[in-house]
Structures are given as C-alpha cells and as structure tokens.
Amino acid sequence: TLFPYTTLFRSDYLKFEKTLISLNGKVLNKGAVFTLIKSNVDTKLYKENIFISQNIFMNITKANEKERKIIEIDNKPARLRYAELLGISPSQIENATLKNPIGRKIGDSIYISSIAGIEGDTLNMYAQVFENTKVEILKAQSALDIQKQTINQINSDFKEIYGIFCINCILRFLQFEAEGNLQELSKGLKSIGEYGGFVSYGEQFNKQHLNQTLTMLVFGRKK
C-alpha cells in the first residue's frame, strides 16, 4: 500500500435496492468516487471491531468467490457445518449470525466477513471470501469496553485532535441500537473530538474488504 486509505460501500437505508453517489452534479448508481487528501496536520487510520477469536476454526472448501457465497465448510454443507461448530441447530442460525461473524486473521488483525443470509445450505456473505482459506467463527465482546480501548489508543497517539472522519458498518449500528447503547457509544466518540462520517454496507481498510467494523481517519497533532 502506497498510502493508508479507507472507503465505504454506500447504504440505501436498508432497502437493499440501489445506492447513489454524486460527483460534481453527476449521479451514478454504479460507480465509485475517490478523494485524495493532502493534509498539513498529522493523520492516522484506525479500525475497531468488537469481535474476538473463540478458537472455532474451519476451512472454506467450496466457495463462489465472485458472488461471495460459502458453499462448503470442512467438506460439509456450509449451513450445517456452521451450526455444528457453534453447537446450535440449523434453525437457530439466523439468530446467531450477527454476533458470530466469520473472521480471517492477517498478522495480528482480524478482518470480518458478515453473513448476509442463508440460501439453502449456502452462506451468502457481505464481504469477499476465498476458497481454500482458513477462517474462524468469532464472538462479540462489550462494545463499550472495546470503545474505551480505542479511545485510549487514539489519545496515546495524539496530543491534539482536530477532527475524525468515521465509516461505521450498518450492522454495528443496528446491533448497538437493539442493545440500547448507541447514544452512549456516540458520546464516547465525541469525547475525543468532533467527528462525522457515513453508515456503510461494507468497509475497506487499506487492501482489506470487511464488515461490522468502524474505520476512523483521525486528524491532529501526534505526540
């Protein structure tokens, strides 16, 4: 990567029909807009997710990478194997996917691919998946505890913060809204500086496409 970058996949407020972007008055529903920022202050890119390993590993043995579908896990139908590994019945999967997404580890970082839905025994994914890769089923931690860690990290890196550009996954938004802690999390982020951004259907953190993640570009003066 020549320089750090983050992007988002625009949402349409859960209609799942089409998304629109605009540049200089031209509106598109299939396209991308890129913004290059040259800043005279310090910047740093962060990502936050609330999921950790629970040591449930599996191999994607058959996938449709173009359509983001997992067909087989460990040479078994994906839906059945996912349920088996979690210790639940296949009928309970839809209630488990939001808090048990699939993760792939690169270095010390976990990148999330969220389950979009079940089609027969196939798992439809929001982010890219690759055949013949080892992945794992994750579990959620306290969003408030994770946010405190994020805030502490940013405050340890910067002595002054001028602003934060945020991209927050729609699935995080829905989860936090359902748990009743959305306002408290918003106040926590506001405690470190002014911020603004978008709710997205997917996030990009440098070269990695991922879900259920908050990416933040912080502007300020580093310590």
Regions found by a protein language model. Name each.
Residues 6-223:
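Hydrophobic alpha/beta core scaffold segments
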Residues 1-5:
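Short, exposed "boundary/linker" segments that immediately precede the start
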